[in-house]
């Protein structure tokens, strides 16, 4: 019988940070990724108008929130504790096509900036999971007859 391996929260955080470092991911890369991605989003014909309606004026708070989000995801810094879904639910005109485009831009940004293939794979895997979760929450409408109602 193998012994169960118990690790403290500090040990798990240290392991995640070591994994990130091995991929070449640190706070500086997260900042680069977020800044470059949202530069592309703002210039995008499909996503730009959605974000322009949601973020008026100073983009810095949103960028900082996204940096905190990814820092918490990758480095376990705990800097993000928000609830992003309600904000997305409040966006008028948001469709599944917007999520597809968001993923395309995110993937292209990763291809252009990621410090390693492992980092690219790690980030896109998480982004796809997040997008799928949001899409289920925003667009899934069960049909009581056993199917799915497509809006």
Predicted features and spans:
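Core of compact, soluble alpha-helical bundle domains
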Residues: 1-151
